[in-house]
């Protein structure tokens, strides 16, 4: 999940999409690559429980199996983030394989099981910038999911992200595709939300998911309780939207694999 703009619902989407995928039978690993560690906090992982983190993964001091922690969400594990990530670029900058650190770590993924079964989805929560952490994510990923808020300037910066994705695809990861664009923070009472949604769909076409994530109080409240919205209030509009998004993601992935 990538977007160099902050505040677009990226971490909220990572947490709740993972939970929704798990609810329909998938086994999901989240890799928190944002030094702020909001995905880790939002899943109830305290700072003291992050003895091994995504930093250790990138510098080669831990395997995915060693870094992953089971969360309170059934079938969801996370490789948590710490503030150490702020210095990881300096640590690996001189390494010839600096863009491939995460991909190399994933080569040992077979060691990790969730409830004795292999992981079926890995969701990488990228930082809100196009830095080496995001490049590592794009090099390691099969596809990119782009959260975009239904607010003015939503498309600002998107062209730069799409250009970066194309550069990664042409040089470092030819299998990389765009899974889709998910519109977040949609307010049906607001004409601007409708206009932005229309503009983005006109610009991006079928890449935009049918599911739109509403602006929802429960989605905002849930992280302060260390829970995804689906565990905090399953019936709220936000939770139901993420369940629909999960089914769309699975359907699109099957279409991409069949292509």
Locations of regions flagged by a protein language model:
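P-loop NTP-binding core
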Residues: 1-259
